[in-house]
Amino acid sequence: VLQKVAVFRAVEAIDANNWDDAEALLKEAKDIGIVPKYNALTLYWQAEVAYHKGDVERAKQCYEDYIRRAPKSEMEYHFAHYGLGYANLALNKMEDAQSAFNTFVREYTMRDSYLYDAHNRLGDAYFAVREFSDARKIYNIVAQASTDQRHYANYQLAKIDGIDNKPKAKIDRLKSIVSDNEGAYVDDAWYELGRTYISMEKYNDGAKTLQEFVDSDYLSPYYVSALSDLALAYYNLGRKDDARVCYEKVVDYDPESADAMEAVRGIREIYVSQGRVDDYFAYAERKGLQSDMSAVARDSLTFAAAKNVYLNGDMTAACQKLNNYLDSFVSGYNRTEALFYLSDCYVVLEKNAEALKTMRLLLDHGRSNYSDRVLDVYSRM
């Protein structure tokens, strides 16, 4: 009687989330250890407590010990396999998880959320070891169910469509999830749809999808990632100002995050590519980006902007940018390279006097990687 009372009081404690009390009562029941039925039940509930408290190895052992002792007619027998499947998933023992969940779904007779959750976890165990055909079969079962578990299964099927190189099927399934607007995986599907378009280089579709997503759900856990991907889509469409606005929103959302640091790099790259270095410095000053306000950073970014114009072949504009750099940074770290590019601009523009003067400045600056090439051109001119 005392053993039975201890077990039932432990179950009551578990129902009340008093896990420490439950653990103590189950130890008491185990120490009594007289009745085989309650010895087995003690193991089952010890497994439940251990799993809840994060001791997954002990939970696995207790579930297995219970299964060896318990009659198959007991409901706990079925749920021991269910719990064992979860324990094996947590321990990354996917074959053992498959075995446990397969037993549960084969022998459990109720058509309820536990059954379809177990199917989903079985699908996950196959998915984790890249057995996608088996995973698809399992998820398809759940996708036809009426319980909420169908939403996860449908989302996983979309991912498998992508893995199986069926982009149209993946996109159609994701769009269906988004348009139905049911369940807990609408955000996941919406964001994944945008990413899928971008991975296929369908930047217009990706930008449209992600813009609608970020406009609709500021609180989504995918909000910041979606903004970063949206910036990438806009950048590839040549809409650099729109891309910069997205990056700025990432910085504003959480300035100290790794995402913000990546966004700052994107903002810097856009300003430099547009030759708007002073605008970037103004932004960096407003945001307190001290590392980008140093003399070295200003030198580097100002030169990078001028170099981009040169590499794009606009020699007239490059002359102006390079001269501005040389005037602003008399002892600049990139002075030699700037003089070389400037002299080449003048040669292309057939401004020979300016070219000779610039080459002379470069040669007088001392030995460099450009000395031999410049000396050859200088002597021939």
Residue ranges, per PLM feature:
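Acidic, polar-rich low-complexity tracts and alpha-helical solenoid repeat scaffolds
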Residues: 1-381
